[in-house]
Amino acid sequence: MKVSLLIFLIILVGVIKSFDINSIDDSHWESDEGFEHHKCWKNLTGYYTEFALSAYNTMFPTPYGVIPVSFYEGGVVTADIKGQQMYVHYGIVAKNFTTWGQYYAYGKNQTQYVVNNSSCVAMKLQFPFPDKLPKFKKVGTTKIGQTDVDVWIVKGKQQCNVTRSCILIQKDTCTLMSANFGNKDKSNLGFSLLNYYRYENKPHYDKFQLPSQCWDVKPKDENENKEEQGLFANEEELENKEYFGDNQQAPSMRITKNNPHLNNNNNNKKYHHREHETPNPDLIKTTTKTSTKTTSFSRATNDSPKSIDFHHLF
């Protein structure tokens, strides 16, 4: 999530001895100076990695606006940059739900698929699949345990300037070790930590094969897509009006058997998630307010609500 481009002189930071994303001066993100395509990935065709992501109160773009979310996600991701395809095997735990499944994205036919509970949902890919990685700037060095790493900040687009992100790369090996995200607004602290395991600088092509349950599935229309993408939505987060503007009532998401279709016609703009299959009791966390489940998700990212930009990688 990005920043207006302000041009002024940058004094480079030498060594970050005790690493904290807040220890990196904001001015590094506010100028184009020093950003370049990392030498390790200039000819990168893709990647594969296992990952674990923990987020607390971190600002994320969603179909309902930019909201703070807290969740844990783990899994596997691989992307073929040249072939414009991505696969994610994910498991997510958040306040009101637990879910897991597989995500497939294909830039060439502009379609994405989510497989959850053996069912498949297809949606139009409403963002361009990137053909290269973003630019980086080295701002220091530190250690993970006793492993020396370089600290690189990520330069992205301007659409959603609410978080800062950096990555830690093992010296001389081009191996991703970790990534850190933090809310730009220091009065509303939020952080995410993303660790990489078994990282490889090449895609696993066998993962891009679409499963048979998706072969005859057609993309849904745009209205249904919005409700499908509301993965992290819960009442406490969506009713935070600060991130929806002064004149927009923050929507609320409930799941009920009596409201099987998305309803956005009432005065309070209450949104109801559409039921797609019989709920699996193991995937539903019940609270006094509502029983919550999700059947799919969107690869919403820290770069833009309309850009993949390799969320799991950077």
From Swiss-Prot:
Keywords: Glycoprotein, Secreted, Signal. The keyword Signal applies. Glycans are attached at residues 43, 96, 109, 116-117, 161. Residues 257-268, 285-296 have a biased composition (Low complexity). InterPro entries: DDB_G0292248-like (IPR040310). The keyword Amino-acid biosynthesis does not apply. It is found in: Secreted. Residues 1-18 form the signal peptide. One of its GO terms (cellular component) is extracellular region. Residues 252-314 are annotated as: Disordered. PANTHER family: CARBOHYDRATE BINDING DOMAIN-CONTAINING PROTEIN, TRANSMEMBRANE PROTEIN-RELATED. This is Uncharacterized protein DDB_G0292248. It comes from Dictyostelium discoideum.
